A protein has these predicted regions:
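A conserved acidic beta->alpha catalytic loop
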Residues: 6-15, 36
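Short, conserved active-site loop motifs that form the nucleotide-linked donor/cofactor pocket
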Residues: 26-28, 79
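Short beta-strand/loop segment that forms part of the nucleotide-sugar
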Residues: 1-8, 28-33, 58
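C-terminal subregions of glycosyltransferases and related glycan-biosynthesis enzymes
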Residues: 182-235
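Donor-binding/catalytic cores of nucleotide-activated saccharide
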Residues: 37, 58-172, 181-196
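Acidic helix N-cap motif at the loop->helix transition within catalytic regions
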Residues: 11-19, 26, 61, 65-67
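Glycine-rich, basic loop-to-helix element that forms the pyrophosphate-binding segment
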Residues: 32-48
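Short aromatic/hydrophobic "clamp" motif used to bind/position activated sugar donors
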Residues: 53
């Protein structure tokens, strides 16, 4: 299934979605008022019926075999979560960069475990990309733990990632660049403004602190999370 959330678009997005939905019954369109990424992704999660879940942002694209590779890895390893590397694609120059430190999972360099959990990576967990879109999640795991995005806040993916990563029993990764993050796109949120809502950042920080207390990881990750959010405020 492909669940497309039309989050109050004002361009030709809905017409394009309807064109493809007529050609493929697996495509489901849900139109709603614009309420931000967290709410839109939660609507997708609430309507998902598949065994696994993955996210693709509207202006990005993936390799044709990305989902097949992530799916096979998940099934063969009985995984709750599997990740892949991300490349950037410059919308103006069409230059592809495969070596972005944060998105290329370089923090795993030298890491040998094929299947792991958060304690195996506790020395560098805060360096792992929190983006939801380069990952495949077992839906039963997400539903069992009632994992959702906080709504109407920036950096909502931080909370979702830690909720998944701290609770997942079996995690793995594919050492390939399978997702393409589009940069320099006119009209994108990042292009419009680099201003940050510091109140939102503090709220997200509190949610993660509560999560660490709930999962008994506060003493393991307190320093890492504090450093992470100082970075977000200064970014």
């Amino acid at each position: 299934e492909i669940i497309c959330i039309n989050d109050g678009s004002t361009d030709d997005s809905l017409n394009i979605l309807e064109y493809y939905a007529k050609k493929d019954k697996r495509i489901k369109i849900i139109s709603k008022e614009n309420e931000g990424q967290g709410t839109a992704r939660n609507v997708g999660l609430d309507n998902a019926q598949g065994e696994f879940i993955s996210f693709v942002d509207a202006d990005d694209f993936i390799k044709k075999d990305m989902l097949e590779k992530l799916y096979n890895k998940s099934v063969n390893g009985n995984l709750d979560l599997v990740m892949c590397k991300v490349s950037s694609f410059d919308n103006e120059t069409h230059v592809i960069d495969d070596n972005l430190w944060y998105y290329s999972l370089k923090c795993f360099s030298g890491f040998k475990k094929e299947v792991f959990n958060n304690l195996d990576t506790k020395e560098f967990t805060s360096l792992i990309s929190v983006t939801p879109y380069n990952k495949l999640y077992r839906r039963s795991f997400v539903e069992k733990n009632n994992i959702r995005f906080p709504e109407k806040y920036i950096f909502e993916d931080e909370v979702f990632f830690y909720n998944v990563y701290l609770k997942a029993k079996r995690i793995s990764l594919i050492d390939e660049n399978l997702y393409y993050y589009r940069t320099n796109r006119k009209g994108s949120t990042v292009s419009k403004s680099q201003d940050k809502d510091y109140i939102d950042v503090i709220h997200i920080f509190r949610l993660i602190r509560e999560l660490l207390i709930e999962t008994n990881y506060i003493n393991v990750y307190k320093k890492q999370v504090y450093n992470r959010f100082i970075h977000l405020i200064l970014w």
